[in-house]
Structure formats: structure tokens, C-alpha cells
């Protein structure tokens, strides 16, 4: 009983701490942005903001369009039709999520640059100058739209496929009795019913696009996120960067509002208690192979081409890529990611336990606050953490001097604790979501039975909840760990001096124009990401009616 009396306040305190931790960078950004910087702001208004807002809006619209057309189209084909290779494509279509946007950008620029692989191949049949004229200009806004869109479309694909698979056959049959063809059924029935799922997928695509800095900067697109980075790095103005960050936060709020608007009046029930799911229509002959080609092309461009390039460069340049630095960077990445995963799981578990033990009120509010972190672009989050972290480091140094001890230096920044904190804030929504879904499958009767047997809340959690939550905990741990490995913006700003991770070392190689030397580091990130994507795909397929 004493343990229970201590446990509940402790868990509640951890839940409040988690919410406060997520809210801290937002609060800090607003406070820093309130500092006057008239000279810099006039410069931003005249020379930075117009292009940054224009490029950001164009990139969001363009990437969203590519992701919507590719994701919804392929999801409809594999959900509603049978054709050669469909079973394989079900597994392959989500795999571009394993390729970070910045790695995709580095790969394609390297492939299509003068004297790159594509140019050298074309010169086998064409004069060098004619071959050069055929190369597309990827360091441009259209290039960024295509590259980022082709690796982010699986967000739309996964959400749309889940909806298409669950649609009742009755709606399509009713439309066909009224003379509607297959295309009209898709346009007027299937697509509107999938609108809420498409809104969720597009919101994730937009948030990931806003978070990107590596691809946009490398491809010459001056987004708001890139402008924040250059304002802080080149002009040394934290206030100016914070003011630009506030604009990004407003944009994030607008995207979330649009996502909720897109999910309005969502159809959550079918016309009967056990709906008959829509059977798949067989595509044979040329139609089947065209469907296969339409689904295989995004996989080829978004996953297979980057993967083969990284494999080739890693083997071809093995003496350069397989040096001690890459393994040191891998160790740093794994260390930061492991620590962040453990802390995020602990805080996520405390947050959901607090709402289960006493639903509603401030506990539910705290749980909702923890979901904000994933919506924060990593660079904005890092800027918001920078001032509090440095303030704590300075306070520790002052306290050490007051005690007559030697100066400890930058404890949080120098140890990597700032990086781990940023990871926890950004990805805390993942374990919270996984564990909330896991707890929803555990009836409250189990808790009542444990109490009637004299077991306290901690005993029930240890003996009942945790064993049943193992799949949710494992899934959350895998996703958080890999997301931490891939995170570039926050790591770039908060990493300790002279410490690199796999993501930042790739960025440094690309900045020096020698991305091939970082191919093995990129390959390690991709290899670590394939497993979680395949794991998520395994649990997203739903049996349908016979073809």
C-alpha cells in the first residue's frame, strides 16, 4: 500500500514533467522572439522572408501533390485490384520511408551531376555536350519537390491503404447499379470516404517537409527552416532565428487545423455490423503489367535506386568509407538514440499510466501536450532548447565556483544531454501513442481483479500491464530508436563540439562535396530503418473478399 501511495504521485509528477519538457522549447522560442531586433528584422523582411515563405509554400504544395497522387494511387491499385507482383509490392511500397530526405537528395544530385553515373552512361551513345544537355537540374524547387515527395509518399499510402481495404462493397455496388464505372466509383465513392485518412497522411508529409533542412539546403531551396539555420549560423542572431521560428510554429498550427478540417464528418461506421469488404478486381494482360509498373516506379525511385547507389559506393570506396570515424559516429548515434529511447519510453509509460489510473482533468491535458513534440520541426525545437540548456550550464558553473570547485564546463551541451533531450521531446508522441493503443486493448476488469486480490497499482502494472504491453513497447522502442538515428536538424545544432553522429557526418561529407565518402554511414541508417518499416507493413494488411 505504501508503494502505491508513493507510486501514484511519482507517476503523476513524471507525466507533468513530460508535458513541461515538451512545452519548454515553444515557451522559450516565444520569449526569445519578443526581444527587439529592428535592424535584423528589416533585413529579414526585405531579403529573407519573401523568398522563404514563397519557397516553403511551393515546396509544401508540390510535395503534398506528389505524395497524394503517388500514395493514394498506389494504395487504390493494391487494395482494389489483383495483378502480377501485387503481394511483393505490398511490402515494397512503404520502404522509401527508410530513406531520409537528405540522403535521397545527396544520392540523386550525385547521380545526375556532370560526370556522374547518368552522364557517363549517356556519353556511351551521345556526345558529352548533348548528354549534358539532357541532365535535369535537380538543385531547384522542382527537383526538391520530386525527390522529397518520392520518399515521403508512404505516409499517404499507408493511411489510404488501410481505409481502402476496409471500405464496404455495398457502396460500390450501389454506385454500379446506377451506371457508375470503375473510375467514377473511385472518384465519387472511394476517394471521398478516404478523405480523413488522406488528411492524416498529408499532414505527416507536410510536417516532415517542414522539418527537413538537409535536402532543402543542398538543393538550393530557401525554406523557412533553412532561413532559420542560416540566420543563426551566419548572422549569429538567436532573436532573429526565434522570430522566424514563430512563423514556422504558426504554419504548423495551420497544418494541424487543416488536417482536422480534412477529417471532419469522417465516416466511422459501415452500413452493417459486419460489412462485406470490397473484393479485388483482377487485372490481367497489359492492364496487370501497367498496374505493376505504376506501383513499382515509386519503389524504384524512392528506395531501390538510392539503396543500390549506397551499396555500390560503400563497396567501391571501402578503403575510404570503412575507416574508424564511421564506427565512432555509429557508436555516438547508437548511444544517443538508446538513451533517448529509454527516457521516452519511461515518460510515455508514466503519461499513459497517469491517465489510466485517474482519467480526465489535467492528466489528460498533459498527455495531449506530449503529442505536440512530433509537430515541432527539429531545428525549431533545438533553438528553443538552446537558451534553457545554456542557462542551466551557466548556473552549474556559477554554483561550482561558489562551492570553490573547478569549472565543470558545458555539462548538458558537452555531454550530449541536450541532443538526447531534443530527441525525447520530438519523439515522445510515439511511445505515448503506442502505449495508449496498447492500454485500450487491456480491459479495466483486469485492474479490478488485481485490486480485489489485494494487488496495488504498481504490482498490477508489473504483473499484468507490462507483459501485455510488450508488443507496444517493442514497436515504440524500434520506431523511436530509428527516428533518432535519422534526425539531422536538432543533432546538427545541439551536438557536442567535435562529436558527430551518422546523420551529421553525412551532412558534413555532402557539404564538402564528397558525399560518396559518407556512403557507408548513409547505408547504416537505411539498413537500420528497413526493419521497422517492414514491421509496420506486416501489421497493416487486412484480408479482403475474394477477387
What positions do the PLM features span?
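Glycine-rich helix-loop "coupling/hinge" segments at transmembrane-helix boundaries
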Residues: 210-235, 486-515
Amino acid at each position: 500500500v505504501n508503494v502505491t501511495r508513493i507510486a501514484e504521485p511519482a507517476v503523476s509528477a513524471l507525466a507533468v514533467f513530460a508535458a513541461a519538457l515538451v512545452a519548454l522549447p515553444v515557451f522559450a522560442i516565444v520569449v526569445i522572439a519578443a526581444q527587439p531586433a529592428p535592424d535584423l528584422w528589416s533585413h529579414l523582411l526585405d531579403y529573407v522572408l519573401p523568398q522563404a515563405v514563397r519557397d516553403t509554400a511551393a515546396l509544401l504544395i508540390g510535395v503534398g501533390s506528389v505524395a497524394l497522387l503517388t500514395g493514394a494511387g498506389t494504395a487504390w491499385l493494391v487494395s482494389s485490384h489483383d495483378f502480377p507482383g501485387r503481394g511483393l509490392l505490398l511490402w515494397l511500397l512503404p520502404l522509401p520511408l527508410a530513406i531520409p530526405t537528405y540522403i535521397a537528395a545527396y544520392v540523386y544530385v550525385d547521380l545526375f551531376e556532370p560526370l556522374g553515373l547518368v552522364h557517363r552512361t549517356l556519353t556511351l551513345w551521345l556526345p558529352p555536350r548533348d548528354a549534358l544537355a539532357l541532365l535535369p537540374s535537380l538543385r531547384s524547387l522542382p527537383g526538391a519537390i520530386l525527390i522529397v515527395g518520392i520518399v515521403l509518399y508512404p505516409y499517404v499510402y499507408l493511411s489510404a491503404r488501410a481505409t481502402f481495404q476496409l471500405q464496404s462493397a455495398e457502396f460500390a455496388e450501389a454506385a454500379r447499379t446506377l451506371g457508375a464505372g470503375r473510375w467514377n466509383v473511385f472518384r465519387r465513392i472511394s476517394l471521398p470516404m478516404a478523405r480523413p485518412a488522406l488528411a492524416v497522411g498529408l499532414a505527416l508529409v507536410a510536417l516532415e517537409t517542414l522539418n527537413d533542412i538537409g535536402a532543402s539546403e543542398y538543393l538550393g531551396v530557401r525554406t523557412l527552416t533553412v532561413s532559420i539555420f542560416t540566420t543563426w549560423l551566419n548572422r549569429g542572431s538567436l532573436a532573429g532565428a526565434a522570430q522566424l521560428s514563430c512563423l514556422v510554429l504558426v504554419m504548423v498550427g495551420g497544418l494541424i487545423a487543416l488536417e482536422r478540417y480534412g477529417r471532419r464528418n469522417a465516416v466511422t461506421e459501415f452500413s452493417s455490423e459486419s460489412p462485406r469488404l470490397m473484393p479485388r478486381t483482377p487485372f490481367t494482360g497489359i492492364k496487370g503489367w501497367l498496374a505493376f509498373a505504376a506501383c513499382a516506379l515509386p519503389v524504384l525511385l524512392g528506395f531501390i535506386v538510392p539503396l543500390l547507389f549506397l551499396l555500390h559506393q560503400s563497396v567501391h570506396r571501402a578503403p575510404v568509407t570503412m575507416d574508424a570515424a564511421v564506427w565512432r559516429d555509429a557508436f555516438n548515434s547508437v548511444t544517443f538514440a538508446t538513451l533517448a529511447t529509454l527516457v521516452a519510453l519511461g515518460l510515455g509509460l508514466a503519461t499513459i499510466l497517469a491517465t489510466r489510473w485517474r482519467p480526465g482533468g489535467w492528466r489528460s491535458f498533459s498527455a495531449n501536450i506530449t503529442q505536440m513534440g512530433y509537430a515541432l520541426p527539429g531545428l525549431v525545437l533545438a533553438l528553443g532548447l538552446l537558451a534553457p540548456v545554456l542557462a542551466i550550464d551557466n548556473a552549474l558553473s556559477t554554483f561550482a565556483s561558489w562551492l570553490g570547485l573547478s569549472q565543470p564546463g558545458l555539462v548538458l551541451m558537452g555531454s550530449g544531454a541536450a541532443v538526447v533531450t531534443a530527441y525525447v521531446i520530438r519523439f515522445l508522441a510515439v511511445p505515448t501513442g503506442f502505449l495508449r493503443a496498447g492500454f485500450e486493448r487491456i480491459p479495466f476488469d483486469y485492474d479490478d481483479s488485481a485490486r480485489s486480490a489485494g494487488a496495488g497499482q504498481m504490482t498490477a502494472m508489473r504483473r499484468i500491464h507490462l507483459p501485455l504491453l510488450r508488443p507496444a513497447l517493442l514497436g515504440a522502442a524500434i520506431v523511436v530508436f530509428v527516428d533518432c538515428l535519422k534526425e539531422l536538424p536538432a543533432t546538427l545544432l545541439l551536438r557536442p563540439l567535435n562529436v558527430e553522429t551518422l546523420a551529421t557526418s553525412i551532412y558534413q561529407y555532402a557539404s564538402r562535396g564528397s558525399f560518396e565518402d559518407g556512403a557507408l554511414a548513409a547505408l547504416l541508417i537505411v539498413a537500420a530503418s528497413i526493419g521497422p518499416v517492414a514491421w509496420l507493413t506486416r501489421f497493416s494488411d487486412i484480408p479482403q473478399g475474394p477477387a
